[in-house]
Each structure stands twice: as structure tokens, then as C-alpha cells.
Design a protein with these regions (language model features):
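Hydrophobic alpha-helical segments, principally membrane-spanning helices and signal/leader peptides
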Residues: 9-10, 169, 191, 258
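Bacterial Sec-dependent N-terminal signal peptides
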Residues: 1-34, 351
Length: 351
């Protein structure tokens, strides 16, 4: 009996071993082919099923398929395929959408290229911040100083620069004597939203609802979860209690857009400058059969009124750089913020 059981056991093992290659071949047959057409279809399907703004942006993705599929040929080069796929992704008008290969990365940059710059780094660096050795301080990517009129100034160039609570304690302690504060996030293309939350938490004394987020739950364009609230918790450490102006332009994007949205919910904060660039979708990454990766917006973020902020956030006070000021090395937006904080300038409804 024992020998019979052993024989049956060995037969079962042999049958399983024989079947495994067949199972593997079945799985491979279901996979998308690593060909120009296969990679095109894979990319189109990823966006069709997972991109979160197709309905909001009123994009006919089926029509986009028809438009670009006719450009795909079996003999096209890798560079040619990349160009077609990159152009197709640009139809989404989303700065969070990139196609990355070994030889190139696609970008959509019309969200800021078609707008005024409203920022001159050389003017800020040379005529407002001054010399790094003597005129301003730097802590974890934040440059800060006290202007001669007792207005504090913080310049944060990227939310990718990590900022700790110890850094913020030192910065706010140093700026404490100031009568008002300017936070300049113009040309800040984003980074880590944890940093935006950590800074914003220094400007509220109570929990504040700042927005909502939804997640994809299915392949349909409108398959989303219920909205989940996003709340800003006040910091347990030093908190700023005086008036604050946040400076923005079209290149304020992604995590910066998130920061501006949070700050706009706070009572002592005024947003000044130009409309932000947007970028409210939480990015996600997927891979094509040929190994190229695609990044895209997968979860939409809304403001506290459940309004989309993908296209950007309007400032409370619209101010553009003045060309005459620029020739004199004057930053119009900084000067308006200083005058506003000192009570020397009351803006009209639309500047």
C-alpha cells in the first residue's frame, strides 16, 4: 500500500511538472506583445482605465486612439514610437504625465510656457536675498531673511528639499520679531507633499478641512471611491500668528499647488501673484511591455468645496511683474506683498 501511494504521489508530481510549461505558455499568450502596436495598445489601455481626469477634462480617449493608432507601424523605430506615444500623452494636458525610456523623457509644459513668468531669479537672488555669506540664512532648502522694513521673507525653491520640524522652529524663531511674513513659492515645481503639510501646519491653531481625495475603484472613467476628507492638523511646536502672504506663479505646481490650497484655507493668509500651474492628481507609475515607464495622475485632489484644482488655484490678489520695475531690478510682486502687509496698499478687486 505504501508503495502504491508513493507511485501515485510521484505520478501527480510528474503531471504537475508537465503541466507547468503549458500554464506558462497560456499566461504569455495573454500578455501584450512587445511590438510598436502592442506598446501603443498597452499605453492607451493604462490611461483609459487608470487616468483620473478623462471625464473632467472632457477628453474623448477613443477618438485619441483612432488618431494615433494610424501612425503606428510594425517597422517604426524606437525613437519614432516614443514620439507618437509622447504626443498622445500630451493630449491629456497634464504636467504629471511622462513617458520615460532609456533615451528620453516626454514632458507636457504648456501649463506654464504660455503664461507670464512673473519671476526673475536674478532679481530675487541679487537684490532681495543678497549674499549667502552675510545677508540671508538657509535651512533645509529654505532661504530666509528680515527685510529692512521688518517684513520676514522665506524663499522655498522645491518641496523636494526635506524640511524638518527643527528647521522650522529655528526659522520661525528668527523671524518672530517681524510684523508680517512673505513665503515665496514661485517657480517651485513641487516635490513631497509631506513637506507642504509640515510647513502649513505652522500657520493654523486648529484642525482645518483643506480638501478631499478620491481613488479609482474600477476601469470606468467615473469609477471612483467616495471623497475622503483631508484635514490639516496644527503643529505642536512654534506656530506663526501674524499676517502672511504666499507668492505664486504658473510654475507653482504639484506639491506647491497642494501647499497653496492648504494655506488658502487659513484666516491670516493671503495668496498673491498669478494663478498656480495646478497638478492636483496623485501620480502613479506603470510599465509598458518594452520596459518604458509611464507616470500619470491616478487620484484626483479637490479643495474644501469639492472643486477641482487640477488647472490651478487663483490668487486672492492678482499681481503681475511690471516690465518697468524689472529694468530697475524691482520685484513687483514682492513689493506689493510688503506694502500689503504694512497696510500701505489696499488692492482693487482685480489688479
Amino acid at each position: 500500500m505504501k508503495n502504491d501511494k508513493m507511485v501515485r504521489f510521484l505520478k501527480n508530481i510528474l503531471v504537475l511538472i508537465a503541466v507547468l510549461p503549458l500554464l506558462g505558455s497560456c499566461i504569455r499568450e495573454d500578455e501584450v506583445a512587445n511590438s510598436p502596436q502592442g506598446n501603443f495598445e498597452a499605453l492607451w489601455k493604462i490611461i483609459d482605465e487608470q487616468y483620473c481626469f478623462l471625464e473632467y477634462k472632457q477628453i474623448d480617449w477613443d477618438a485619441i486612439h483612432d488618431k494615433y493608432s494610424r501612425l503606428i507601424t510594425g517597422s517604426m523605430s524606437s525613437e519614432g514610437l516614443f514620439e507618437v506615444l509622447g504626443n498622445m500623452l500630451n493630449e491629456l494636458q497634464d504636467g504629471h504625465v511622462n513617458l520615460a525610456s532609456a533615451h528620453n523623457v516626454s514632458y507636457y509644459d504648456a501649463w506654464y510656457q504660455d503664461y507670464p513668468r512673473n519671476f526673475r531669479e536674478d532679481i530675487v537672488e541679487d537684490f532681495y536675498l543678497g549674499k549667502a555669506s552675510t545677508d540671508y540664512r538657509t535651512a533645509a532648502g529654505i532661504k530666509y531673511k528680515i527685510f529692512e522694513d521688518n517684513i520676514g521673507y522665506m524663499r522655498y525653491e522645491s518641496f523636494s528639499s526635506g524640511i524638518g520640524n527643527g528647521n522650522l522652529d529655528e526659522i520661525l524663531s528668527y523671524l518672530a520679531p517681524c510684523s508680517g511674513l512673505i513665503i515665496d513659492v514661485r517657480n517651485n515645481g513641487g516635490g513631497n507633499v509631506t513637506n507642504s503639510e509640515r510647513i502649513a501646519a505652522r500657520f493654523t491653531n486648529e484642525k482645518v478641512l483643506t480638501g478631499y481625495i478620491r481613488h479609482k475603484t474600477g476601469k470606468g472613467h467615473n469609477d471612483f471611491s467616495k471623497p475622503y476628507p483631508i484635514e490639516l492638523e496644527p503643529s505642536n511646536s512654534i506656530r506663526w500668528q501674524k499676517k502672511t502672504v504666499v507668492l505664486t506663479n504658473r510654475r507653482s505646481y504639484s506639491a506647491t499647488n497642494d501647499f497653496v490650497n492648504q494655506m488658502s484655507c487659513l484666516p491670516n493668509v493671503t495668496i498673491m501673484g498669478d494663478k498656480t500651474g495646478g497638478g492636483s492628481g496623485m501620480p502613479f507609475t506603470s510599465e509598458l511591455p518594452n520596459g518604458w515607464t509611464v507616470r500619470f495622475s491616478a487620484s484626483p485632489h479637490f479643495n474644501a468645496d469639492m472643486e477641482q484644482i487640477e488647472w490651478g488655484i487663483e490668487p486672492d490678489i492678482k499681481v503681475n511683474m511690471d516690465e518697468t520695475d524689472e529694468t530697475k531690478h524691482i520685484d513687483t510682486i514682492i513689493e506689493k506683498a510688503r506694502a500689503f502687509l504694512k497696510g500701505e496698499w489696499t488692492p482693487a478687486v482685480s489688479e
